[in-house]
């Protein structure tokens, strides 16, 4: 690995903090149309590994690994339990955690949305509706105002294609829907949210000093039968939906998905061009 390669660890609030009340905690309690539980054996996150209370111990473990960075997400549902109401005690908690990281020479990398959001936002329609984007932007502004003086690396949204496909195509993530067109709309709205947040935060105090990026995982989809034309068409379509549409949008300002009979969407926003300081 090159000398400048960054080694670190990463978590998501819902996966480690415990006692979250959000779209995922609600989904964990639900059942599918056939009556089967959404989660195998009705497992629920519960207190998880209690990172909320045990973060000082966890940070010591990170330090023992001799890595330099820790990416974590802040839990929107805890920071803003009701629309328009921010919990100062929760904001203070994350502030102490950031200070502890810095004291241990670990660089904090803050993620603003990692799969979860408040139930009140879910009831508004979440990212199914473009008009809800300003609500997310407002949350991001408040968090950025609190921590931008100490946090230099910011991730807007974690893996938007996962949220869109697993939540709205396969139905394996909340809200458990299976609608390919809606999946494309949600992906478009998540990317629109990223672009808006990027530009708003860049105009705030410290905005030009920090780096703001999007977290995108790349999954390669190969044809089942390499000799079969239809399999190639399917794999190419899935690759474009999951990977290329996001990359193209940030390079050209054009978001385009065209899968006959499944999803058809075209959106242009030139503000998206280069609206990321890093991508990964």
Predicted feature descriptions by range:
Residues 1-39, 83, 91-280:
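Active-site region of glycoside hydrolase catalytic domains
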Residues 74-88:
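Glycine-rich, proline-tolerant flexible connector loops at the mouths of alpha/beta enzymes
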Residues 25-60, 65:
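Aromatic- and Gly/Pro-rich amphipathic surface segment
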Residues 45, 52, 81-84, 126:
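Short, flexible active-site loop motifs that bind/organize anionic cofactors or intermediates
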Residues 4-6, 52, 69:
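A common structural microfeature
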Residues 54-75, 107, 274, 278:
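Catalytic domains of carbohydrate-active enzymes, especially glycoside hydrolases
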């Amino acid at each position: 690995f090159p000398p400048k390669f960054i080694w670190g660890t990463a978590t998501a609030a819902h996966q480690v903090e415990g006692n979250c009340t959000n779209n995922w905690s609600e989904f964990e309690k639900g059942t599918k149309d056939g009556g089967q539980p959404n989660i195998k054996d009705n497992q629920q996150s519960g207190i998880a590994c209690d990172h909320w209370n045990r973060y000082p111990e966890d940070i010591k473990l990170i330090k023992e690994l001799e890595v330099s960075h820790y990416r974590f997400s802040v839990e929107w549902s805890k920071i803003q339990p009701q629309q328009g109401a921010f919990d100062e005690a929760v904001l203070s908690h994350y502030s102490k955690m950031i200070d502890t990281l810095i004291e241990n020479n670990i660089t904090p990398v803050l993620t603003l949305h990692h799969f979860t959001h408040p139930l009140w936002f879910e009831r508004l329609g979440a990212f199914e509706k473009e008009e809800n984007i300003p609500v997310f932007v407002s949350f991001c502004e408040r968090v950025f105002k609190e921590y931008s003086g100490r946090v230099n690396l910011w991730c807007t949204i974690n893996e938007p294609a996962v949220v869109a496909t697993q939540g709205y195509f396969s139905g394996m993530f909340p809200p458990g829907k299976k609608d390919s067109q809606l999946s494309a709309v949600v992906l478009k709205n998540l990317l629109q949210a990223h672009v808006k947040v990027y530009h708003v935060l860049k105009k705030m105090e410290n905005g030009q000093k920090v780096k703001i990026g999007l977290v995108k995982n790349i999954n390669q989809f190969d044809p089942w039968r390499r000799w079969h034309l239809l399999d190639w068409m399917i794999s190419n379509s899935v690759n474009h939906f999951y990977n290329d549409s996001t990359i193209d949008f940030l390079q050209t300002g054009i978001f385009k998905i065209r899968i006959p009979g499944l999803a058809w969407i075209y959106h242009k926003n030139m503000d998206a061009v280069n609206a990321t300081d890093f991508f990964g």
